[in-house]
A protein has these predicted regions:
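Generic C-terminus detector
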Residues: 172-174
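Phosphate-binding and adjacent anionic-ligand microenvironments
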Residues: 1-169
């Protein structure tokens, strides 16, 4: 989702768990760790977010309440939410994420998506944005990730960039 979460959590000594995409995986982490500490929040790349342990799924009302609370706190400091984000970037660095989807419909689309994933596994890129790839993580190999098997690949380069590739589980896209 974003490594900015990890950077902020690290400053405050808060444990971060990486899970597969989907709130069922976030809810599972909450369930398995209920007796070990407080769950603060969880989020995923589709902008779903959850705060606290009450609702173990995407929770738009609490997310809106948290944004309102952040805005109120920022106003008390004489700042806007934008200025607060600039403060965060100044302290932790700027993180940029983007999502690109390729839609491939029908049976031919399913086959093309499978072929793209197979090719990415067999012929991983040597560079990302001109920087050498230093690590490839294949989520089809639970022994590499400690997570359930999933059709996901991640490529890391020397510059610190990360590219994740996965077919959607609900739509005809990769």
């Amino acid at each position: 989702t974003t490594e900015l979460i990890r950077a902020i959590a690290q400053k405050f000594g808060v444990q971060v768990y990486n899970v597969l995409t989907g709130f069922k995986f976030i809810a599972d982490i909450v369930r398995r760790n209920e007796d070990k500490g407080e769950f603060i929040c969880g989020g995923e790349e589709s902008y779903g977010f959850n705060v606290g342990q009450f609702v173990r799924d995407k929770d738009a009302p609490i997310s809106c309440a948290m944004v309102a609370e952040c805005a109120a706190w920022a106003a008390e400091q004489g700042k806007t939410l934008y200025q607060l984000m600039q403060d965060i970037y100044a302290e932790f660095g700027y993180y940029k994420e983007s999502l690109t989807s390729l839609v491939r419909k029908g049976k031919a689309g399913v086959e093309e998506i499978a072929a793209i994933m197979a090719d990415m596994r067999d012929n991983p890129p040597k560079e990302l944005a001109g920087s050498p790839v230093t690590k490839v993580v294949d989520y089809n190999k639970p022994e590499e990730t400690g997570l359930p098997k999933s059709n996901v690949l991640q490529f890391f380069n020397e510059a610190g960039d990360v590219v994740s590739v996965r077919p959607s589980g609900t739509e005809p896209k990769i």
